[in-house]
Amino acid sequence: MKKDFISILDISREELANLIAHARKLKEERRVGIQTPVLAHKTLGMIFEKSSTRTRISFEAGMFELGGHALFLNPKDMQLGRGEAIRDTARVMSRFVSAIMIRANRHDEVLELAAHADIPVINGLSDREHPCQILADIMTIEERLFRTEGVKVAWIGDGNNVCTSLILSTILTGMEVIVASPSEFAPGEDVVSEALRMGAKVRIVTDPREAATGADVVMTDTWISMGQEEEIDRRRQIFMPYQVNAELMACAKPGAIVMHCLPAHRNWEITDEVLDSKASAVWDQAENRLHAQKALLVRLLA
């Protein structure tokens, strides 16, 4: 039976631990120049409905380093962009490539693609979740803090797709997450209810200081996701009290780290001072997309 990676909950706690351990091994092997072509003759088809820097580069480089090949597919250059049904695209691609990664506008598109594909489908981002990002985030937290169990994470800002995956990941990691968002932009009640029902430690507040107090990790993300450009002035006004700055970081534990999945709008959701500080794990976090996704690809295809 094929395996997909559409939600962070598509893997178990044990599978997550093994995947992160493998990612760290792959990272060390890359550092010393060891590359094993375990995915030789494998091809990853990558559909990008949204533009990308980190997702595209990390998956392309990852497949190359594992001995495989990645194809960049823009829907505008495919029949999918001219109205071909997703289910037909899924069936055809299943005959040509080994797996599909899609960066989609709508989560339903990812689900439909997976339902009709005979090969693994990876959610490279949707409007509901960004599970590949959370793999890298968990890896980064383990590297910096040497554990996830009991780690307190403060999410500051928009309760978006990355926030959703973070909340759901607490079921697998034992982390505690406190989300500080304006009420209008809080995470979906269905997400929070599901996480709580499964034993997660999640709390939603509106005060960023309350969330950051005693935090081991302070995380944020852009206030303006792709497709929201027309709301830029309104969103900036609403979210400015949620800026991650030195004053907010002073509420966190001594030695706390700050994370941002990028791209960052400097001096909006996070100040230059914090992003470029010793507390910043942002660049390791970005690099770890490569290693975590390589481990995921091996798990799905090797």
Curated annotation (Swiss-Prot):
Q: Which reaction does it catalyse?
A: carbamoyl phosphate + L-ornithine = L-citrulline + phosphate + H(+)
Its UniProt pathway annotation is: Amino-acid biosynthesis; L-arginine biosynthesis; L-arginine from L-ornithine and carbamoyl phosphate: step 1/3
Q: Which SUPFAM superfamilies match?
A: Aspartate/ornithine carbamoyltransferase
> What EC number(s) are associated with this protein in UniProt?
2.1.3.3
Q: Localized where?
A: Cytoplasm
Q: What role does this protein play?
A: Reversibly catalyzes the transfer of the carbamoyl group from carbamoyl phosphate (CP) to the N(epsilon) atom of ornithine (ORN) to produce L-citrulline.
Q: What is this protein called?
A: Ornithine carbamoyltransferase
Give the organism the record lists. Answer: Methanospirillum hungatei JF-1 (strain ATCC 27890 / DSM 864 / NBRC 100397 / JF-1)
